[in-house]
Amino acid sequence: MQVDDFIERWLGSGGSEMATAQSFAIELTELLGVPRPNVSDKDGDFLDYRFERPVTLTHTGRKRNGRIDLYKKGHFILEAKQFVSPETKDKNTLEMFLEKDAPKQTGHGKRGTSKFDDTMMKARNQADNYARAVAKEDGWPPFLMVVDVGHVIELYADFSGQGQGYN
């Protein structure tokens, strides 16, 4: 797949993170020419490169479970979100009447809004918390990626190995 084909294919994505994030990540790895994530074994062991890597988060002495959207030990944590583009077309009354009544998926909200910015920052904090959780066993990953599937890949790096300066 060529870069332009990849962009065109994913530009229209929106609404459902669960339905798009893993396919997007697999196609991105193919585009970059790197191996795909591993398949978890029957025991669900923590593989070094996998989707939905379980982690235990500890905050103020309380523990809760989480799952990293995509994790590669010693390389990165990817946290995916899915937003929708704001509609640009003005609809007339007839078009609105003829639309199906089924609700549209809105994902985490509309791109280009303050909610988009807030949610992407929360996703960045979520990835940082995941990094803190895996650092105990695996060390700090040098990269955190926050993705709005098909539209934005925000990359934060900390090469110190301390997890204190993801910028």
What are these regions (language model features)?
Residues V146-V147:
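Charged, structured surface patches that assemble and position nucleic-acid processing machinery
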Residues G163-N167:
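Glycine-rich phosphate-binding loops of NTPases
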Residues M1-F143, V152, F159-Q162:
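A short, conserved, highly charged catalytic patch centered on acidic carboxylates
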